[in-house]
Amino acid sequence: MENGATQSTQRARGMTKVIVDGKEIDVPPEYTLLQACEAAGAEIPRFCFHERLSIAGNCRMCLIEVVGIPKPQASCAMGVKDLPPNKDGSPKILNTKSAMVKKAREGVMEFLLINHPLDCPICDQGGECDLQDQAMAYGVDDGRYRENKRAVEDKYIGPLVKTIMTRCIHCTRCIRFTTEVAGVPELGAIGRGEDMEITTYLEHAMTSELQSNVVDLCPVGALTSKPYAFAARPWELNKTQSVDVMDAVGSAIRIDTRGREVMRILPRVNEDVNEEWISDKTRHVVDGLRTQRLDQPYVRVAGRLQPVPWKEAFATIASKVRASSGKRIGALAGQLAGVEEMFALKSLMAKLGSKNIDARYPGSPLHTKFGRASYLFNSAIAGIDDADAIMLIGSNPRREAAVLNARIRKRYLKGNVLIGVVGEKADLSYPYNYLGAGPETLAQFVEHAPAQKEKPMFIIGQGALNRPDGAAVLAMAAKAAASLGVVKDGWNGFNILHSEAALPGALDIGFVPEEGGMDTAAMLKAGELDVLFLLGVDEVEVPAGGFVVYIGTHGDRGAHRADVILPGAAYPEKSVTYVNTEGRAQMASRAAFPPGDAREDWAILRALSEPLGQRLPHDSLGALRQALYAAHPHLSRIGQVTPGDASDISKLAKLGGHHDKAPLRSCVSDFYFTNAITRASAIMAECSALAHAAARTAAE
């Protein structure tokens, strides 16, 4: 009676009972046998199977025994629901450790190694190679093959991915990734059997901004990182968890260092943000951390920057600040600034009696006073998976947030979603309905909108906001959101897509001018300020005349204009908090040390406050964070999204103003050159040149 009740409960839940290596478990019928075995704790080797790619069933390494079926089965390609039922109705028995399975795996491994070269000592995959690990665990100690091995010519597929195709085992992970995830089907297979080759057909550089993820996916050494070739072995490296700042997505990354040098950057899994992908810019900007670095303080003397001790640099700044008043002192924060240093700079400016602080692009309508929901990606990035209609307004997510764009493509492949674009036409890697170029298109769309969807979403890029009529465009989008059900009970699809890592955090702590303070545009007018502090600001033109203090990492535009340079720490060189575009506070840990006399930005500001006569109270990073969390408690919830109040969006509708007919354009014109670190990178320069050449060729 009890057994019958249990079976009835399982059927009601839609679960299927199987026995794996003697262990009885219930699994959903849509599981593959591989997933069922892993749910039971069994380890199943694989090369071609990947959780985020379609099933290929190429490698046959995942063979298991299904009792009742005479031959071993590929567990990745067979579903639980496909199992033939036992005549007596008993659960199917799956064996992963039987003699049949052991012999089958040894045979598969022997075939895989027939043509695989003995390159392990010179292979960059050595030490983190799936083939090495599985050959040790499931192979035999001697092969019977004595004929000549095949050799395959290496292919050129760009400056980022190195190919040694003789090592390829034809798992096709790279093909499936570029086709399905990246949406740029540039890799494919030609030939069959032993003559099969992975190629770009016509030899050329790949164009996807996510192409280097194939290096992580490749289970052997066929595809490796070209810039990292022969640089280090994995066991030599210290590994530090951190956060990417090349865009505002806040992808989870791992920074590998050797000594004081950053050697490489790899992705970490974060299902809610980047899944397990990162952009090529995130991964390969490493060489930009080594070049054009500021490693000591400088003061401009007779028109030339001269290296000086810290004490002299501080004294020079103090003399200028004392000669001015709070109303004629201002501070701007750049796109890579962390929350802690912006909080310290805001505190210092308050002590100096200045309300002139800003981190926004000149003329941006975003402001703390409208509430958090007015400037965040409110549905969260994972909310894209649930949307049934997506409108991109003044945004090209492929250039502004490549990983987020892959998420939109993933939603498109799932089906039953409408995607519309207001702004520039571009290849986004998925089809969309082009509605028009200018803001007036949005008004027309509201008037002739189709039937409301269940979970519609607006994604508003900075290209729609960083323009003279940005406030009017934002107000129009807020009104459209209200009329189309973008914001309603249980769903907030009104999303601002930031392109700068610092801006959401700056808005969270109020690093914007208060009543009576000057914004970015006002501070950049000639003659308005006597002293201007630039915290890593390199994207704006600072007029001549005022005294400029630059705290930053590279000899870029801001440093060239500066009268005093204080060398700071780049993002891998400091422990700092960033808030991503969805409002998720994330901690970046220090992986390396800044070069020379450079120091962490908050420490520079703390030291500077003393000669200015306005001593900041925090003597340690812990004390600074304690003050930060007291003022903004939500920032202490690391890794969590603190949602904004959806009613705040209605405030935006009251902004008003007139919009012009100028087309909306993406705020990012060159994916590979977006900040000082990327502009210092030779690899990014090469990628940029190739991208421009490809664009010219496509236009011809």
What are these regions, as identified by a protein language model?
Residues 59-80:
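N-terminal single-stranded DNA-binding subdomain of primase/primase-helicase replication proteins
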Residues 55-60, 249-251:
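Short, basic and Ser/Thr-rich N-terminal targeting/leader segments
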Residues 2-30, 35-38, 50, 65-69, ...:
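N-terminal export/assembly segments and adjacent metallocofactor-ligating motifs
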Residues 623-700:
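Long, low-complexity segments enriched in small/aliphatic residues
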Residues 36, 44-45:
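Protein-protein interaction/assembly regions in multi-subunit complexes
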Residues 361-641, 696-700:
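Non-catalytic alpha/beta scaffold blocks inside enzyme catalytic domains
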Residues 47-55:
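Serine/threonine-rich, repeat-prone extracellular segments and beta-strand-based repeat modules
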